[in-house]
């Protein structure tokens, strides 16, 4: 694990500007200079002595999902994005996933002294999702949420698994997520993100040793 277990990532392309601050153990967190100007909201926002979360991507349902991921992972997290939403939600969603994955990878550093493998189940009313993660340095994602609607709020449902795939690719983790049951696509999606959070928290549980959990002797 990295010494600080914190990361700051800035990703700037011709399509989006994203900056992310992440603290795996929660606590106070801030970004020095916002890229949002005056266009700020407080919907996906909370602040306490143990956790600071502020997610502003310009896509409301994406904010909601990332907020749930951070909350149940125990992270403090600030996400700011200014993207080409006049085109569609693809670049914003993908780049936020890539930047968040990079931040997680940098905050973890070398994988040692942790379980490495994590499993999470999370219900939301009638929906139940399962996530399994391996901090493996082998980026791969299998995501099956069975979503039926074209959009949830202003987020295309096809971008929900794509966010998780982009996140896993950039974090260099293996991630399997599936929704086992559920009739409401909002519930299916949210239970999936919460399950991922539980799995990540499990994978990062300290073992009480400084060992690398691999026969290779190194991970990440």
From Swiss-Prot:
GO molecular function: imidazoleglycerol-phosphate dehydratase activity
A Pfam family reported for this protein in Swiss-Prot or TrEMBL: IGPD
One record GO biological process: L-histidine biosynthetic process
Entry EC number(s): 4.2.1.19
Pathway: Amino-acid biosynthesis; L-histidine biosynthesis; L-histidine from 5-phospho-alpha-D-ribose 1-diphosphate: step 6/9
CDD domains: IGPD
Reaction(s) catalysed (UniProt annotation): D-erythro-1-(imidazol-4-yl)glycerol 3-phosphate = 3-(imidazol-4-yl)-2-oxopropyl phosphate + H2O
Enzyme class: lyase
Family classification: Belongs to the imidazoleglycerol-phosphate dehydratase family.
Listed NCBIfam families: PRK00951.2-4
Protein name in UniProt: Imidazoleglycerol-phosphate dehydratase
Protein source organism: Eremothecium gossypii (strain ATCC 10895 / CBS 109.51 / FGSC 9923 / NRRL Y-1056) (Yeast)
């Amino acid at each position: 694990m990295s010494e600080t277990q914190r990361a700051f990532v800035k990703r700037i392309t011709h399509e989006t500007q994203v900056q992310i601050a992440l603290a795996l153990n929660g606590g106070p967190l801030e970004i020095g200079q916002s890229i949002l100007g005056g266009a700020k909201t407080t919907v996906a926002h909370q602040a306490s002595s143990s956790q600071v979360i502020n997610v502003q991507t310009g896509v409301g349902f994406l904010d909601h999902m990332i907020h749930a991921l951070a909350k149940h992972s125990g992270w403090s997290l600030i996400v700011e994005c200014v993207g080409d939403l006049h085109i569609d939600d693809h670049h914003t969603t993908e780049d936020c996933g890539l930047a968040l994955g990079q931040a997680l990878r940098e905050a973890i550093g070398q994988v040692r002294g942790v379980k490495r493998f994590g499993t999470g189940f999370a219900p939301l009313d009638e929906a139940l999702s399962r996530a399994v993660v391996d901090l493996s340095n082998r980026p791969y994602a299998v995501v099956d949420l069975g979503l039926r609607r074209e959009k949830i709020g202003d987020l295309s449902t096809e971008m929900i698994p794509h966010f998780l795939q982009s996140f896993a690719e950039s974090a260099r983790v293996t991630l399997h997520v599936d929704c086992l049951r559920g009739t409401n696509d909002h519930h299916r999606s949210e239970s999936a993100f919460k399950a991922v959070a539980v799995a990540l928290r499990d994978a990062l549980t300290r073992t009480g040793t400084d060992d690398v959990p691999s026969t290779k002797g190194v991970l990440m």
